[in-house]
């Protein structure tokens, strides 16, 4: 038979999209090659019919009805156009060319003996068309001898062989190839070649013989002309013209894909489910089919899927069909949930079902209903659920009723009672008989009703009938309201009785309701039970309580029915019943409709509005109000949901039975921020319910152990002290109370833990109110006493003692009296914060005072003493040795006895201490290391004595002022020794001792000259709190007409680097001093080194004690000439090195010397005072950072530091706001923000998977990212990144070893889109990597040095890139990652083999791998001290991860290295660097233009042009360009920044983004911007409007100068040596905390290769100390660079250091070791001497105006900035 000959695929899948989903006749398993007859041509259908018949007739009469076989005509079967075959199965060349088949001149490949053919087989040609039958290839035909042995195992016999085979029709078009190939395969199968045809998996059962190959080849040519074949077939045959099997294999695969849709539709249309398999399995099967169709672009809606599923449900699941019948919005997930629910319930019932059924007698008593109950006691289920093992009564859905006649408030009916339809079968069953049903069903529709029967409902409490024919004594319904399970009203027309006449004459009557709107007549078992009638479902009878059988009941379907023949009919007409209430209910609107129309208003509001005629065209009588008052709107219940109301006093009735100390309330408060570690951050309170006695315990944390210790203590205390046992503890649901440890503690002690409900804090009111009361007391006590905030718990404890002793308004006794304790002894209590003097029983010396000032806190718990706080010792003591200080002063400040020595003015300043911070605002500090809050801020009135002019007669005329204007200055928020200009204690300012300036003391910098960089009077001062003219605090305009010095103490300026600043003396004799020349340098020198010609008014900053020795560091020989350049000559070779040789070729500005300015008129040099309102320049901190005072002669520097330590504990009432709940506003303090800056947070420039692909709306970009994604996956698989042989279960692997992974996407600078699969190394566990391993990359200085040497030596520069570099490094640790998202393996893990990007160890692994390869295979050596710099005799390599830069004199040497690298790594040549013309590179972000032997230019114009506009900075491309990034004269305001939380985060993020980009550019090549970048980076966490404006100004300047480049020119070939020079500078005290800014610029052979601008790590007390610090920072890097240069280039090297500080040079040169101020700077100087002499370092002086390092340390005027930078960057 044909079915036996055809090859059947046992793995065939489901169908095609063309199948009808409603067809049930389609077989589930079809031949994948079969096609529908409707899709075939007419002659194909006929041939299909022929082939489908059984082989029971001879071949000569196989299909006599086919007219083609009777008289074949060429018209009906188109003859092949290929011509006749050759005798040996080959076409002749002419025939081949004629039929468009290529002749391959390889006849030997296909020659074979002519196989056996039947006489009926004719060679096809135009004159002899193909016959309708072709004899099959016989398996018994002789094979060649050599093939017989080869195929000896091939079966040689078939069970049945067909005599004739119907040939396929000839291919007529390319589109019909898929249909044609099906018939051709069928033809081959009928020719006994089915076992050599590949199936859909590409498998074959045996190899074909040579003869069979020729047969397939020839027949394929005969019926498939070459020019009609599809393109993909031609491509296969062009490669191998005889590879027909490949064509057939791919054709089968394509047909399988097409047929899969049909099979899926067939499977979906024929779904069946009866619960025999799990619901989960059924859901997975259906979901898989739907998902597969969706992947083929066929979307199956939820409604269609639900309909197909419901159609196949049976058994207990069939009822769902009726439930979903009327639904329009079907959800597939909801249907699956319903199926799962039924399946689970049936599973439980089957587990609980007894193994044996009871006998009939055993069920009798169980199933009978008690006559005294309202509801039946029969154990039955709702008809929604069934157990087919035994019959059950139906139970309808709840029907809520409200009636004075009803005994039960709910009735039960079917929710789908819509219409009444009857079965055709009207036969009543006999007693005890049950209708047989072929299949259990749960669907309740009209076909299930048993006509003329009542449905017995065990759940309904009322009987309902549709016909009034049986209703007796009917009365209109006026009060009964019935609703179904969906809360829909069921109208009741009438109320009456049903009269029954049972067997043996028993009559009874029950109440019934009439309604036509139900599907069945319902008989309530509850109503029957009231008449002592029960239903026995084991015998199917209605019985009396005594067992008398009244009537049989019938089981039909799943329900039990009682025949209506037992009902006595009435004579009331149906029309009468239906019209009983018609007059009352006609034309009335339902209340739910009006409720919705009027916006879900409440019942009373609607009714009252209608009564008052507030709504027109609607009357109160028009609405059906019958159930309006009880109507529950589901939308209102959801939308208007509220918490339950707490009735006042309701708690007491539940707790009256408890005795004292049996019921406790507890709660935890905290944390309190910004406290020292020794102070508690939390407290836990307890309150007894009966006595209201209170306890508080301090806590440092909320750990389980800490809480458990407190509970142990309180329980033991109550048990021992009050002889009581705690029974109940009420608390909230915080994790500190709900943990297992505490729960076990309560369980073991028999204590009931009473928790509040979710989000119900009012239920915990006792504890919450106590915490509020204690905190109110705490704030009040601390504010009154002025004590520091770390004593807050002492205030809480004091409040607890007092509250326990006072009578509350609700009680007639105090808590102590309720507890049986004595009242509080008032003589043992001191006011909180009462000043006392404590006896020091152990003084350090016999002559030291024995009294220590302190403050009383509270009575001691552990002794009869008192807890007293001692500020000087910063601790509390428990003592009775104290004396109360009787005065009216309560502030802590009054006990600093040094303040008593101050004058009256300073004492007046301490008279008041006002806070300018609102009480309710929240303080948040960013200093995580602050021990305590000292955010003191006060208004300080500076009112000095009138100034007396002390100018000579040649200068200004004196002018006496009656009174100095008063100016209020707000002190900085953070009081600290390093930042406070007044050394402020609360409300206290230390007295100032005038510092006398030596008239001869000037800066070492040459003669006095006028400022050549700016016009006279152009410099600006800026005073904070500057008033408009006319105000008392006006700034005085010091013009030439008004040249007096008065009120200068109100002028506040800051030191800008080395520029001399205004100096104000605090005595009456105030002089303005100017620079002179030829003075002795001193370590305490207050002078600076830049802009020496500008007359400056200087305010002294952190003066050193008068007894500090100064160093005469400048020998007489250096005082005689302003241009002397002292140098240090370490060895004899220094004779050939001069200052000119060091300064030669350096990019220093050319200065034109001018004659000294006439200084006879002092006022000419006093600049105007301007008030600039534009974007301010960078000038460091504001005036408060400069206005500092000298210390008293009575104290040394060490004493002052001790005093400041004490003041840090000083209380500021503003800090107690940290005890309050946080608010939406936050205040940012400048000092705290600067402390909080650790580093610039990198801004994310990459995209996640969802951003790049899933939700990317740019389709073009999305496609590029998808392409990059697949490229990355291919590369990962190629590199064997993970083990693909095994997937690991997530639960079996240690979580520490599991690394999260993700895809990141970005767009490279060249426009290509990149995808990278990376590991989340930021959350990698420390145990999974070796922290000692280092991931190294080339230092930027090393790259710049290599580029500079390449320019001077005409090197070729080659740029390479290694693809997926990290993946070449193996990983040693056992790590696992989650698979990529496209695999869909969320619960599986892959084991890593390679160092994936992002892992902590990947960089180190790759570094070790490439380092080993370069050393061992490329003969390279790594330069010591400079990682990732490798060299040999010819080539230098700089390595940055996967980027390599090669430098060589010979390009072939570079090529040799490239060849070696390509043997191991996928190496791409980015730029070979050949040629003598200008070559452009993009090396690590630098855009480099290089022309050998001439120049090199480094810039970032393209990158900045692309990136800067994306920063959302208001650039002004067409406006006036900025000429400098900032100018001196304006300062960053210290006023607190009050800002919303969200806005603050947004601005900080913006600052990070802007400064991050600026920093990247600055450290690459824009060294002239480093000062501004470094200063702004310190203010990232203080994003005030002013800081943002400064940042925008910097970005604007970068935009205006984006085309600037760092220019290098080749060194002169006449110079044989390399010259490495560092230029150093420092700006004294111009940074926060009076730190100095230091800067260094490094040059190699006159080319700037690097720069550094940073804040000094230590505070310097003079400009000389700052300069020493700057030089000490430059020398180590200078030595390291020297070593690198010598390794890369063997020329001799000269190292030079230039500074504009003569005193620093003198200190380095001097041998005097006795005059250093302290040990630190002494050792600094000594080390400098050693390094200079030991490293052949030449130190020379450079003029300040030529010092290009000035741009690293201070803001400069425009002309000065351009003058210092235009030689090396332009």
From Swiss-Prot:
The enzyme's E.C. designation: 3.4.23.-, 2.7.7.49, 2.7.7.7, 3.1.26.4
Binding site for Mg(2+) 3: 1625, 1667, 1700
Catalyzed chemical reaction(s): DNA(n) + a 2'-deoxyribonucleoside 5'-triphosphate = DNA(n+1) + diphosphate; Endonucleolytic cleavage to 5'-phosphomonoester
Biased composition (Polar residues): 1-39, 49-60, 399-408, 415-435, 1009-1024, 1065-1082
Region entry Disordered, spans: 1-89, 360-449, 1005-1038, 1059-1135, 1171-1222
Amino-acid positions noted as binding Mg(2+) 1 in the UniProt annotation, renumbered to this chain: 667, 732
Domain of life: Eukaryota
Cross-referenced SUPFAM superfamilies: DNA/RNA polymerases (SSF56672), Ribonuclease H-like (SSF53098)
Keyword flag Transcription: no
Record keywords, A-Z: Aspartyl protease, ATP-binding, Cytoplasm, DNA integration, DNA recombination, DNA-binding, DNA-directed DNA polymerase, Endonuclease, Hydrolase, Magnesium, Metal-binding, Multifunctional enzyme, Nuclease, Nucleotide-binding, Nucleotidyltransferase, Nucleus, Protease, RNA-binding, RNA-directed DNA polymerase, Transferase, Transposable element, Transposition, Viral release from host cell, Virion maturation, Zinc, Zinc-finger
Domain Integrase catalytic: 656-831
Reverse transcriptase Ty1/copia-type domain: residues covered: 1353-1491
Location of region: RNA-binding: 295-397
Motif Bipartite nuclear localization signal per UniProt: ranges: 1193-1227
Residues that, per the record, bind Mg(2+) 2: 1361, 1442-1443
Site (Cleavage) location in chain: 397-398, 578-579, 1232-1233
Entry PTM: Initially, virus-like particles (VLPs) are composed of the structural unprocessed proteins Gag and Gag-Pol, and also contain the host initiator methionine tRNA (tRNA(i)-Met) which serves as a primer for minus-strand DNA synthesis, and a dimer of genomic Ty RNA. Processing of the polyproteins occurs within the particle and proceeds by an ordered pathway, called maturation.
Record region (Integrase-type zinc finger-like): 579-636
Any further remark recorded for this protein: Retrotransposons are mobile genetic entities that are able to replicate via an RNA intermediate and a reverse transcription step. In contrast to retroviruses, retrotransposons are non-infectious, lack an envelope and remain intracellular. Ty2 retrotransposons belong to the copia elements (pseudoviridae).
Note on domains (UniProt): The C-terminal RNA-binding region of CA is sufficient for all its nucleocapsid-like chaperone activities. Integrase core domain contains the D-x(n)-D-x(35)-E motif, named for the phylogenetically conserved glutamic acid and aspartic acid residues and the invariant 35 amino acid spacing between the second and third acidic residues. Each acidic residue of the D,D(35)E motif is independently essential for the 3'-processing and strand transfer activities of purified integrase protein.
Function field: Capsid protein (CA) is the structural component of the virus-like particle (VLP), forming the shell that encapsulates the retrotransposons dimeric RNA genome. The particles are assembled from trimer-clustered units and there are holes in the capsid shells that allow for the diffusion of macromolecules. CA also has nucleocapsid-like chaperone activity, promoting primer tRNA(i)-Met annealing to the multipartite primer-binding site (PBS), dimerization of Ty2 RNA and initiation of reverse transcription.
Oligomeric form and interacting partners: The capsid protein forms a homotrimer, from which the VLPs are assembled. The protease is a homodimer, whose active site consists of two apposed aspartic acid residues.
Name the UniProt record assigns to this protein: Transposon Ty2-DR2 Gag-Pol polyprotein
Species of origin: Saccharomyces cerevisiae (strain ATCC 204508 / S288c) (Baker's yeast)
Gene: TY2B-DR2
């Amino acid at each position: 038979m044909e079915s036996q000959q055809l090859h059947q695929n046992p793995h065939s899948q489901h169908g095609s999209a063309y199948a009808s989903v409603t067809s049930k006749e389609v077989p589930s398993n079809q031949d994948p090659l079969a096609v529908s007859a409707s899709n075939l041509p007419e002659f194909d259908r006929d041939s299909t019919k022929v082939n489908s018949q059984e082989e029971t007739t001879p071949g000569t009469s196989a299909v006599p009805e086919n007219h083609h076989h009777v008289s074949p005509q060429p018209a009906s079967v188109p003859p092949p156009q290929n011509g006749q075959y050759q005798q040996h199965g080959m076409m002749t060349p002419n025939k081949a060319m004629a039929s468009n088949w290529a002749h391959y001149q390889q006849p030997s490949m296909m020659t074979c003996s002519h196989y056996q053919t039947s006489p009926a087989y004719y060679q096809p040609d135009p004159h002899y068309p193909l016959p309708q039958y072709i004899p099959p290839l016989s398996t018994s035909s002789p094979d060649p001898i050599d093939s017989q042995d080869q195929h000896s195992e091939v079966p040689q016999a078939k069970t049945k062989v067909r005599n004739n085979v119907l040939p396929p029709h000839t291919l007529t078009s390319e589109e019909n190839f898929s249909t044609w190939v099906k018939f051709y395969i069928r033809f081959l199968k009928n020719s006994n070649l089915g076992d050599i045809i590949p199936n859909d998996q590409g498998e074959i059962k045996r190899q074909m013989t040579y003869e069979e190959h020729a047969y397939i080849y020839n027949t394929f040519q005969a019926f498939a002309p070459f020019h009609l074949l599809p393109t993909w077939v031609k491509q296969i045959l062009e490669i191998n013209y005889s590879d027909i099997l490949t064509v057939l294999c791919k054709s089968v695969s394509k047909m399988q894909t097409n047929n899969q849709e049909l099979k899926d539709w067939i499977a979906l249309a024929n779904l069946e489910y009866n619960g025999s398999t799990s619901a989960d399995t059924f859901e997975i099967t259906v979901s898989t089919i739907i998902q597969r169709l969706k992947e083929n672009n066929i979307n199956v809606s939820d409604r269609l899927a639900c309909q197909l599923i419901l159609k196949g449900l049976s058994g207990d699941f069939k009822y769902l069909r009726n439930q979903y019948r009327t639904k329009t919005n079907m959800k597939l997930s909801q249907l699956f949930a319903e199926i799962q629910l039924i399946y689970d319930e049936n599973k439980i019932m089957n587990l609980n079902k007894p193994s044996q059924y009871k006998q009939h007698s055993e069920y009798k008593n169980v199933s009978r209903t008690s006559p005294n109950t309202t509801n039946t006691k029969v154990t039955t289920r709702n008809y929604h659920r069934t157990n087919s093992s035994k019959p059950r009564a139906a139970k309808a859905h709840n029907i809520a009723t409200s009636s004075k006649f009803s005994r039960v408030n709910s009735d039960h009916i079917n929710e789908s009672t819509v219409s009444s339809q009857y079965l055709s079968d009207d036969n009543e069953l006999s007693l005890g008989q049950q209708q047989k049903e072929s299949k259990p069903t749960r669907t309740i529709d009209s076909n299930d009703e048993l006509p003329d029967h009542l449905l017995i409902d065990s759940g309904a409490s009322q009987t309902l009938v549709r016909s009034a024919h049986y209703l007796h004594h009917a009365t209109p319904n006026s009060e009964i309201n019935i609703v179904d399970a969906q809360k829909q009203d069921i109208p009741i027309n009438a109320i009456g009785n049903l009269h029954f006449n049972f067997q043996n004459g028993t009559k009874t009557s029950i109440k019934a309701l009439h309604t036509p709107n139900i599907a069945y007549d319902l008989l309530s078992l509850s109503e029957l039970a009231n008449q002592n009638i029960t239903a026995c479902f084991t015998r199917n009878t209605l019985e009396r309580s005594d067992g008398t059988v009244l009537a049989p009941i019938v089981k039909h379907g799943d329900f039990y029915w009682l025949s209506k023949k037992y009902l006595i009919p009435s004579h009331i007409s149906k029309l009468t019943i239906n019209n009983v209430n018609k007059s009352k209910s006609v034309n009335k609107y339902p209340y739910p409709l009006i409720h919705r129309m009027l916006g879900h208003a409440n019942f009373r509001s609607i009714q009252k509005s209608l009564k008052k005629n507030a709504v027109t065209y609607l009357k109160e009588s028009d609405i059906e109000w019958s159930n309006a008052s009880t109507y529950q709107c589901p939308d209102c219940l959801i939308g208007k949901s509220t918490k339950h109301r707490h009735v006042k006093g309701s708690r007491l009735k539940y707790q009256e039975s408890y005795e004292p100390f049996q019921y406790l309330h507890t709660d935890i408060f905290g944390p309190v921020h910004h406290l020292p570690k020794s102070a508690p951050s939390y407290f836990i309170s307890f309150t007894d319910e009966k006595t209201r006695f209170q306890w508080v315990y301090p806590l440092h944390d909320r750990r389980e152990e800490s809480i458990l210790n407190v509970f142990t203590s309180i329980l033991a205390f109550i048990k021992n002290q009050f002889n009581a046992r705690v029974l109940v503890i009420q608390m909230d649901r915080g994790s500190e109370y709900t943990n297992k440890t505490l729960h076990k503690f309560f369980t073991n002690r028999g204590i009931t833990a009473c928790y509040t409900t979710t989000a119900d804090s009012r239920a915990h009111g006792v504890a919450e109110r106590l915490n509020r009361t204690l905190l109110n007391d705490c704030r009040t006590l601390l504010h009154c006493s002025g004590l520091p905030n770390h004593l807050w718990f002492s205030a809480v404890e004091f409040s607890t003692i007092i509250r326990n002793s006072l009578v509350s308004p609700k009680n007639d006794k105090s808590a102590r009296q309720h507890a049986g304790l004595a009242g509080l002894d008032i003589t043992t209590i001191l006011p909180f914060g009462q000043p006392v003097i404590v006896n020091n029983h152990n003084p350090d010396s016999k002559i030291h005072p024995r009294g220590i000032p302190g403050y009383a806190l509270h009575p001691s718990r552990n002794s009869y003493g008192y807890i007293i706080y001692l500020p000087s010792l910063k601790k509390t003591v428990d003592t009775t040795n104290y004396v109360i200080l009787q005065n009216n002063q309560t502030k802590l400040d009054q006990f600093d006895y040094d303040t008593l020595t101050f004058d009256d003015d300073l004492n007046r300043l301490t008279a008041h201490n006002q806070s300018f911070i609102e009480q309710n605002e929240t303080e948040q500090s960013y200093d995580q290391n602050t021990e305590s809050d000292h955010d003191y801020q006060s208004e300080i009135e500076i009112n000095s004595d009138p100034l007396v002019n002390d100018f000579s007669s040649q200068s200004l005329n004196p002018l006496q002022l009656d009174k100095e204007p008063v100016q209020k200055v707000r002190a900085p928020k953070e009081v600290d020794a390093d930042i406070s200009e007044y050394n402020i204690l609360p409300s206290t300012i230390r007295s100032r001792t005038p510092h006398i300036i030596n008239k001869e003391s000037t800066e070492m910098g040459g003669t006095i000259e006028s400022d050549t960089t700016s016009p006279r009077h152009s410099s600006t001062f800026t005073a904070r709190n500057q008033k408009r003219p006319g105000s008392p605090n006006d700034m005085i305009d010091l013009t030439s007409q008004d040249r007096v010095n008065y009120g200068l103490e109100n002028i506040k300026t800051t030191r800008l680097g080395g520029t001399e600043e205004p100096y104000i003396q605090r005595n009456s004799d105030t002089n303005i001093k100017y620079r002179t020349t030829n003075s002795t340098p001193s370590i305490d020198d207050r002078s600076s080194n830049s802009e020496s010609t500008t007359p400056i008014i200087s305010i002294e900053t952190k003066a050193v004690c008068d007894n500090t020795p100064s160093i005469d560091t400048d020998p007489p020989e250096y005082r005689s000439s302003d241009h002397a350049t002292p140098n240090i000559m370490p060895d004899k070779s220094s004779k050939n090195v001069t200052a000119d040789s060091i300064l030669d070729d350096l990019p220093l500005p050319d200065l034109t010397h001018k004659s000294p300015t006439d200084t006879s008129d002092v006022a000419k040099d006093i600049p105007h005072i301007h008030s600039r309102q534009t974007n301010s320049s960078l000038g460091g901190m504001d005036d408060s950072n400069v206005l500092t005072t000298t210390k008293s002669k009575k104290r040394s520097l060490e004493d002052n530091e001790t005093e400041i330590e004490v003041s840090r504990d000083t209380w500021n009432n503003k800090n107690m706001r940290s005890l309050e709940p946080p608010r939406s506003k936050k205040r940012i303090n400048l000092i705290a923000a600067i402390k909080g800056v650790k580093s610039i947070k990198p801004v994310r420039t990459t995209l996640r998977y969802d951003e790049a692909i899933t939700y990317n709306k740019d389709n073009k970009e999305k496609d590029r990212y998808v392409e990059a994604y697949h490229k990355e996956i291919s590369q990962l698989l190629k590199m064997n990144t993970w083990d693909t042989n095994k997937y690991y279960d997530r639960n079996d692997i240690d979580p520490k070893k599991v690394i999260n992974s993700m895809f990141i996407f970005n767009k490279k600078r060249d426009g290509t889109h990149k995808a990278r699969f990376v590991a989340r190394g930021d959350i990698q566990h420390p145990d999974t990597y070796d922290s000692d391993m280092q991931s190294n990359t080339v230092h930027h200085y090393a790259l710049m040095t290599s580029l500079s040497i390449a320019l001077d030596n005409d090197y070729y520069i080659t740029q390479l890139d290694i693809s997926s570099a990290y993946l070449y490094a193996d990983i040693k640790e056992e790590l696992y990652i989650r698979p990529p998202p496209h695999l869909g393996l969320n619960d599986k893990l892959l084991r890593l083999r390679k160092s994936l990007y992002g892992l902590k160890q990947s960089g180190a692994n790759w570094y070790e791998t490439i380092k080993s390869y370069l050393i061992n295979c490329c003969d390279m050596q790594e330069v010591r001290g400079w990682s990732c710099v490798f060299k040999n005799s010819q080539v230098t390599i700089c390595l940055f991860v996967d980027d390599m830069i090669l430098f060589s004199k010979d390009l072939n040497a570079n090529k040799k290295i490239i060849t070696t690298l390509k043997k191991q790594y996928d190496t791409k040549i980015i730029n070979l660097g050949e040629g003598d013309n200008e070559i452009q590179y993009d090396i690590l972000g630098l855009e480099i233009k290089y022309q050998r032997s001439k120049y090199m230019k480094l810039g970032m114009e393209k990158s900045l042009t692309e990136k800067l506009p994306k920063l959302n900075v208001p650039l002004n491309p067409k406006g006036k360009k900025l000429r400098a990034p900032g100018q001196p004269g304006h300062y960053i305001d210290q006023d607190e920044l009050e800002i919303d939380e969200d806005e603050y985060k947004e601005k900080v993020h913006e600052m990070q983004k802007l400064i991050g980009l600026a920093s990247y550019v600055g450290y690459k090549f824009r060294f002239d911007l480093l000062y501004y970048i470094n200063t702004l980076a310190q203010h990232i966490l203080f994003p005030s409007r002013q800081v943002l404006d400064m940042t925008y100004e910097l970005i604007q300047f970068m935009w205006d100068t984006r085309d600037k480049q760092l220019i290098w020119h080749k060194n002169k070939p006449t110079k044989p040596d390399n010259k490495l020079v560092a230029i150093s500078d420092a700006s004294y005290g111009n940074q926060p905390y009076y730190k100095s800014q230091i800067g260094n610029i490094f040059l190699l052979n006159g080319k700037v290769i690097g720069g550094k601008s940073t804040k000094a790590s230590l505070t310097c007390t003079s400009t000389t100390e700052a300069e020493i610090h700057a030089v000490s920072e430059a020398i180590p890097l200078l030595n390291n660079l020297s070593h690198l240069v010598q390794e890369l280039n063997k020329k001799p090297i000269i190292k030079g250091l230039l500074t504009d500080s003569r005193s620093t040079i003198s200190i380095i040169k001097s041998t005097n070791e006795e005059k250093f101020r302290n040990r630190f700077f002494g050792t600094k100087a000594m080390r400098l001497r050693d390094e200079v002499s030991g490293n052949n370092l030449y130190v020379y002086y450079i003029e300040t105006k030529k010092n290009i390092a000035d741009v690293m340390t201070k803001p400069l005027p425009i002309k000065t900035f351009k003058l210092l930078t235009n030689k090396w960057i332009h």
